[in-house]
């Protein structure tokens, strides 16, 4: 019954889902992902069921899968072989974030840090990283410091031609470093550099921490595991590390733009501490850029599983009788709960793909050794946008999985739905690489720094240029809802920038110091400013993509998707739009919500085909509720029957207990 029904919904679509997939992802990307999936299907180590593995089992299987991926030799450098790398990491992210993390932390985080902050003296190490002759980890976070990177406490002191690393307190112990607990042979570690009694500030270093033959830690280094975590993160070796007079060669300093001379003098070509920090910030952005994709993938899973299941699930109908029950996807409320996340999955993908292109250009310029004011500005803009997009994407992703689980009713709570595991897997995306509310402050700090330059703001990615013109208040709706939404966002962002800046000035004039001012402007002002700027950029970039799209046959449905995504996001700012004076009276809000309801309804005939265009292969999806054949009940029962007549040992005790109770009641 279910399969023909899902086919019926597929036939409602006005477009070819394969063409849409190719248009959004690129034909080569789709082909490469299919090759990766085929390789995974052919290897028993990638086959799985719905059992919950122990921590040791998870780490063992992640290790074996990682070995197999390395043996495939699909890529060496994520920047010179970008398409292969993204095809592999996206497929692995969908399959298991634990396996993906093992690969990503080594190549894309550790490797990128050494490349971007190192020099020729680190070439041998870079080569070993690319050849997977070593395993890398990235050690920034400490027990007592995460987001406040400038105040980390680990020290690296220059002494007789070497660097001596120390952990001065419990709060300075490095932690949350993936790959560190058991596997890492080398790490990028951040510490305060002390030369001739002076603290030269926050610097990056690369050091060996284990012997690659015995895997024993080197003298002066203690490494341990951080214990159990929910979901796939059990498979990630998050470790802690403590230094006690560990000596490393001077070459450990990642010396692009700074160095220590043989006679012990600190030298730097950076013009300021902020310029030096911007290079590090650009490096840190790579992690946040990857986490944006996690938000996209979460929305993809949520909408795929819940929408497909909503076709198979029939409940109630206009007249009594089981034969008259209708799919729950027909209910407008079910559509309203799920379709916005379907639109988010597609739009965030388009946005993230463009952002990756910009970031790759930025990183290549850094690696080539360029130093310019324009590149420094590029770094700040990358940092501002990644610090805004990571929270927006991950909040949507985690939210979508929670809504999907509830929209699937009781069956959604089964392990075989995969929705619960996915919620556990994606929940930490809101805190790692920067707690969301904290890093939004980094976005607003950069935007507020532009407040005095309105009229002449120029940035490499042009994400802030709209602030140069004072926007108008709402007058009327046009025939293009996306243009209307962007106009509202421009007003909202401009107004929030002006009012937040004015409030900061007022607080400073009242005697508050900069720290107090920065904290007091966050609620309802700076946080909203960062979110508005980010969402405007997301919508604008997707609109640009649609203007340039080659396959015109899929443009109309993508326009419907963008209409829904933009209206869905803007509706969340409705109260602020009224408070700021963008509109008055109830009609603007009523019209906005009516347009949102219509945008949801317009997507119903397209929904299953849109899901097909974004859904991973069933082997990767691994959900009984969300399989592409629409046979949810059959897949559920297939799993149920695996547990037929399995009697646990305690049933004998139960029988004896009931017998005693029965005998007692007769007395």
UniProtKB/Swiss-Prot annotation:
Subcellular location: Peroxisome
Record's keyword annotation contains Glycosyltransferase: no
Tissues of expression: Expressed in intestine.
CDD domains: AXO
Active site (catalytic residues): 433 (proton acceptor)
Annotated InterPro entries: ACO, ACOX_C_alpha1, Acyl-CoA_Oxase/DH_mid-dom_sf, Acyl-CoA_oxidase, Acyl-CoA_oxidase_C, AcylCo_DH-like_C, AcylCoA_DH/oxidase_NM_dom_sf
Pathway(s) it belongs to: Lipid metabolism; peroxisomal fatty acid beta-oxidation
Enzyme class: oxidoreductase
A GO molecular function held by the record: fatty acid binding
Stored Pfam families: ACOX, ACOX_C_alpha1
GO term, biological process aspect, one: fatty acid beta-oxidation using acyl-CoA oxidase
The enzyme's E.C. designation: 1.3.3.-
Regulation: In contrast to other acyl-coenzyme A oxidases which bind to and are activated by ATP, does not bind ATP.
UniProt motif Microbody targeting signal: location: 665-667
UniProt: FAD binding residues: 138-141, 146-147, 178, 313, 334-337, 410, 435
Keywords recorded for this protein, A-Z: FAD, Fatty acid metabolism, Flavoprotein, Lipid metabolism, Oxidoreductase, Peroxisome
UniProt KW Thylakoid keyword: no
Known function: Involved in the first step of peroxisomal beta-oxidation by catalyzing the desaturation of fatty acid-derived side chains of ascaroside pheromones, which regulates development and behavior. Specifically, shortens indol-3-carbonyl(IC)-ascarosides with 7-carbon (IC-asc-C7) or 9-carbon (IC-asc-C9) side chains and contributes to the shortening of ascarosides with 13-carbon (asc-C13) and 15-carbon (asc-C15) side chains.
UniProt family annotation: Belongs to the acyl-CoA oxidase family.
Name under which the protein is recorded: Acyl-coenzyme A oxidase acox-3
Species this protein is from: Caenorhabditis elegans
